[in-house]
Swiss-Prot record:
Protein name: Small ribosomal subunit protein uS14
Purpose of the protein: Component of the small ribosomal subunit. The ribosome is a large ribonucleoprotein complex responsible for the synthesis of proteins in the cell.
Textual note on the cofactor: Binds 1 zinc ion per subunit.
Tagged with keyword Metal-binding: yes
A Pfam family of this chain: Ribosomal_S14
Main location: cytoplasm
Annotated source species: Sus scrofa (Pig)
Length: 56
């Protein structure tokens, strides 16, 4: 078992490493509120399609 076997061998059941964006699988800037589970970049892209409106 070489180094590639140890890379993702630790179980990720909780914490930042266990969650990812449902669109692009990114782990940074995740919006979990309301069960969105999207990174902020994908949220900006799909916010209008989801039904969010930008208030002035």
């Amino acid at each position: 078992m070489g180094p590639q076997g140890f890379y993702w061998s630790h179980p990720r059941k909780f914490g930042q490493g266990s969650r990812s964006c449902r669109v692009c699988s990114n782990r940074h800037g995740l919006i979990r509120k309301y069960g969105l589970n999207m990174c902020r970049q994908c949220f900006r892209q799909y916010a209008k399609d989801i039904g969010f409106i930008k208030l002035d």
